[in-house]
Regions:
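RNase H-like two-metal-ion nuclease catalytic core shared by retroviral integrases
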Residues: 128, 150-172
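Single conserved hydrophobic/aromatic residue that forms the stacking wall/gate
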Residues: 1-11
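Short, flexible loop/turn elements at secondary-structure junctions
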Residues: 29-33, 74-76, 122-124, 154-157
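Electropositive, glycine- and tryptophan-enriched low-complexity nucleic-acid-binding patches
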Residues: 52-119, 124
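C-terminal accessory extensions appended to soluble enzyme cores
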Residues: 177-246
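Extended hydrophobic secondary-structure segments that form protein cores and membrane-embedded regions
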Residues: 25-26, 115-122, 150-155, 189-190
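Charge-mixed, compositionally biased segments that are often intrinsically disordered regulatory tracts
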Residues: 12-52
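Two-metal-ion acidic nuclease core segments, chiefly of the RNase H-like superfamily
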Residues: 133-149
Length: 246
């Protein structure tokens, strides 16, 4: 486990790719947040005698529901994209957020790149063993023409994910003590998150409803152009673009 974490996440592979000017992103999904006038941990400065009022109990409100922020953090440029989902936290949602990062930020910064490194947890919406996860990066490869190298953190090491402390920890500080009254408020708070080192965040709502329980046919899995690493190939693999596919 230590070899995996120090050798891949913080050492040789990202450093090598960064030295070549290739993109390295760390992706993760923040916990779902209730949308509405609910108490939020922490505090903020308010005029004396005018505290923000919030109910003592939190229940999901019809028509508002929950928000699931999924982030892609560009390790080299200290900037990130966040898609705020309004449905299930699925593999399709994760891949959609990765595509949004590429379309909105990555393409302009890494035009002509031949490979992308994605560092992520081994569970949640991007599990290494998930059949639903891998067709997504394959479609991304076919469309972008890049190889996508995926490195999943092994169980018990999710705190090594850079998206957690570089991005989501800062977002939590930004909205502490603030009721997340609407999706617009959530997007505004996330997009205005910054740090003393110059973190830049862009954000948008993903309005698509993602369904759970979707099955991937064996034929679709067999069509994925994947090369697994000798060391824990279920965690480390490269997906390549297929010739002739858009």
């Amino acid at each position: 486990r230590l070899t995996k974490v120090t050798g891949v996440q913080t050492c040789a592979l990202p450093i090598c790719m960064l030295a070549q000017g290739l993109p390295v992103v760390s992706v993760d999904c923040k916990k779902k947040e209730l949308v509405g006038n609910f108490a939020n941990g922490g505090g903020e400065w308010r005029p004396r005698g005018a505290p923000t009022q919030a109910p003592g109990h939190d229940f999901e409100l019809p028509g508002l529901g929950k928000a699931a922020p999924y982030g892609a953090c560009d390790v080299a440029r200290n900037e990130a994209w966040v898609s705020v989902g309004v449905s299930a936290d699925t593999a399709q949602f994760a891949v959609s957020a990765l595509r949004a990062w590429w379309d909105q930020m990555g393409r302009a910064r890494y035009d002509g790149a031949s490979r992308l490194l994605v560092c992520c947890d081994g569970g949640g919406s991007n599990p290494g063993r998930s059949r639903l996860w891998k067709p997504g990066p394959q479609g991304f490869c076919d469309r972008s023409g890049m190889e996508v190298e995926v490195c999943h953190l092994p169980p018990g090491t999710s705190k090594w994910n850079k998206a957690g402390h570089r991005l989501f920890a800062q977002i939590s500080k930004r909205w502490r003590g603030r009721p997340l009254e609407s999706l617009e408020v959530i997007v505004s708070l996330i997009a205005s998150t910054t740090t003393s080192t110059g973190l830049e965040v862009r954000c948008a709502v993903d309005p698509v409803t993602y369904e759970r329980g979707i099955r991937v046919a064996d034929g679709e899995m067999d069509a994925i152009d994947i090369a697994r690493d000798e060391f824990h190939g279920e965690w480390n693999y490269v997906i390549r673009p297929r010739p002739g596919l858009p």
